[in-house]
Each structure stands twice: as structure tokens, then as C-alpha cells.
Amino acid sequence: MDDLVREELPNGTRRLFARDAQGGEAGFAVIEPGRPGQPAMVEVQVRPEHRSCGLGGRLVRAALDEAGPGAYLWDHENSPASQAIVRRNGLVPVRTLCQMRRWLAYPPLPEPVFPDGVSVRQYQGPQDDEELLRVNNAAFDWHPEQGGWSIEKLRERLAQPWVDPAGIFLARDEQDRLIGFHWTRTHPQTQTEHKLGEVYVLGVDPACHCKGLGKALTLVGLRHLRDQGLAQAKLYVEQTNAPALATYRGLGFTVHAQDVAYVRG
């Protein structure tokens, strides 16, 4: 196996990859820089035919060295091979994301009930961006990936080809001030998954004390996904976020899988 090759990608992202004897890509690691005060994120993939030869561990060590102190290594598989790499490299878990899923036809989705004075409409374009950014950053000021966005990052995300403005729902108070939003997403069918909806981002302004707003916004988005003909929806939630877990369980979601972030001990 040749030495690892380094590649600089946009926005400070770096990529390390290894080639096999025929020059094909055997595996790679992606290093995404964290925002100020937050750790870098590392993900590693090795092609099945090149596993069990030490390449995964080599990529993990090289990527963590390059990413710097405190970098997170994400494990999306929790397989025996990935757990062996974790043990051999003295990595310890620091964060767990629960992927939860729900069938959209049953149990039936109830009608959303919004607090008095709250109205909901769909995203209408750039005129909504500043308010959307304000609520996002207030709701996720603690979050390594979702918080601390700039207007440029928000608009870059909104410009992605998968974004459907009709699937972004904005909740406003009696003063027409944005107090919460639900951004949904649809994932196309793959070889291993059917077409799938997602509660992509759900944010409520922490200054808003409207009880039940998050639940109502969730239901609006889920009913939209159902009406698009989707059979199932997923979401991701921090394992430590007990109130959110309770809300989603109350709406019929169950844990489908877990993604775990590790750091060097």
C-alpha cells in the first residue's frame, strides 16, 4: 500500500487516502475543522476488499494526528472491526448520537396543536435567512456542528440540490417574529435503504416559552413527509438530551442505531 496522500478540500476540510497496487483508492479519512472552540471531526472508510490488513487503524492514527488534540473520531458501524481499532488505539467514547425512526402511516400522526398566537408558514426565500440564522444559532449555541453558523454557511446549505423550500416550516409569534423552525429532508432510495424522510433540523428559540412548540413543529414536518408519499422518517438526537428523547418517543420514534464519537484517552 502506498503512503497516504493528502488532499485539501474547500472550507478547510482535508482528506487522506491510500491507494492499492493498481492505483485504486483503498480507503480514506476526512478531517473537518471545528468552529472556534470546537473539535475537528474525523471519519474513516476502508473498502471491504482492503479490510483486515491494518489500513483502518493506520488511517485513524494518521487522521487523528493531523486533526489535532481533542479531535472526534466518528464510528457509524459499531462493528467488531471498528471496536478493535478503538481498543488498540486507546480511544474513549465522548458523544453518542441516537438515530431514531418512525413509520409515518402508523401509529397515525395527530394534528399539530400550536400555542395561542403562533402561526406557521413555509420558507419563502432569502428574506427569511437572517431570522432563520438567529434562531438556529440561539437554539444550537452548544452544538459542535449546527451552532455558530454564518449567513454564508446557511445559504450554502440552503443551496444544496436536495433542499426543498416547501419542506422548511417557520413558526412565528403574534409580532411576526420567528420563534422556531423545522427543516425536513428527503433521502433518495439506495441499494440498502428505501426512500426516507428526515427531521433534518428542528430548532426553537430558547427565549420562547411556548409549551409544545417543538412537538407541534415536529408533527407539521412529519405530516408533510407522509403526504409526499414517504413511508418512514428518521432523526438524530444526542443521547444526553433527555427532554428531546422523551418528546420523540412520545411521538412514536424508537432508536434504530447509534453513532459514537471517540477521542484519544
Swiss-Prot record:
EC number(s) from the headed UniProt entry: 2.3.1.189
Top-rank lineage group of the source organism: Bacteria
Species this protein is from: Segniliparus rotundus (strain ATCC BAA-972 / CDC 1076 / CIP 108378 / DSM 44985 / JCM 13578)
SUPFAM superfamilies: Acyl-CoA N-acyltransferases (Nat)
Protein name: Mycothiol acetyltransferase
InterPro entries documented for this protein: Acyl_CoA_acyltransferase, GNAT_dom, Mycothiol_AcTrfase
Reaction(s) this enzyme catalyzes, per UniProt: 1D-myo-inositol 2-(L-cysteinylamino)-2-deoxy-alpha-D-glucopyranoside + acetyl-CoA = mycothiol + CoA + H(+)
Residues reported to bind 1D-myo-inositol 2-(L-cysteinylamino)-2-deoxy-alpha-D-glucopyranoside: 3, 145, 185, 198, 236
Gene Ontology BP, a term: mycothiol biosynthetic process
Known role: Catalyzes the transfer of acetyl from acetyl-CoA to desacetylmycothiol (Cys-GlcN-Ins) to form mycothiol.
Annotated N-acetyltransferase domain residues: 1-110, 118-265
Metal-binding is among the record's keywords: no
Record carries keyword Plastid: no
Annotated binding of acetyl-CoA 1, by residue: 44-46
Molecular function terms, GO-annotated: mycothiol synthase activity
Enzyme class: transferase
Record PANTHER family: N-ACETYLTRANSFERASE (PTHR43072)
